[in-house]
Amino acid sequence: MTRKLFWRTRKKSPSARNLISLALDDVRSILNSADIAKEWAACAPRLSELCQIEDGKTGGVNPGDRRALFYLVRAFRPARMLEIGTHVGASTLHIVAALMRGAWEQIPRLVTVDIEDVNDSPHSCWRQVGLAKSPKQMVEELNARVEITFVTDDSRHFFATTKETFDFIFLDGDHAHETAYEDIVNSLEVINKNGLIVLHDYFPGGRPLWSDGPGLCGPFTAAEKVRATGVATKVIPLGSLPWPTKLGSHVTSLALITKSR
């Protein structure tokens, strides 16, 4: 049924018309921003206190990627943001920290979706891996002036039923290439003008980025399939960050989906 819903709600061919157009130099300028670095330095101690999630132990986004997300969200200042794949809340917390900084005409909104109940179930991942706080508890302790909605649903059904649109979408859900493809296509339908899509676990060519395991093919294959169907997208892998990520490297699996022309 959910697959039928997905196809029924697609009213037209996917288009990159609403995506922002960026170059790698634009992204590097953001990641090397002195102003955002000052904001990061001001909030990083509190984030480390709340987000006591050891890298490599929970499957959560690594510390360097969390910082990169903070920088990207601060730079693009989305009023409405979507995250697919809450998991233990590492990325969620850093997104909220970025959203809460700055002057807003309206309260910014984050919708974060996961197929599991990430907060209250006895089987929630944060409990299973021995963390002290749920994603909801972590973000509540920030006292952020941000509207946050946790949704327990699979991404296909969420996209098929949501009436919302978003300025910035972070995709870190099911990495099977079919689901990742559908997530990208569905994101294109709900992205606002000059919007941005960010992928996690994007391994160019499906090749390993680190020595601790094989590369993941799903997000890369999905993004290539979108382009192969004629959608004018461009993927910008962030490659190496100005700060450490994991295993003593600066390498990241984050990548941006932008308009190619």
Task: Place the predicted regions along the sequence by residue.
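S-adenosylmethionine/decaboxylated-SAM
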Residues: 55-56, 60, 66-261
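Class I SAM-dependent transferase core
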Residues: 34-63, 71-75
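Membrane-proximal basic amphipathic "stem/tether" segments
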Residues: 1-46, 260
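Residues that form generic nucleotide/phosphate-binding pockets
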Residues: 30, 46, 50, 138, ...
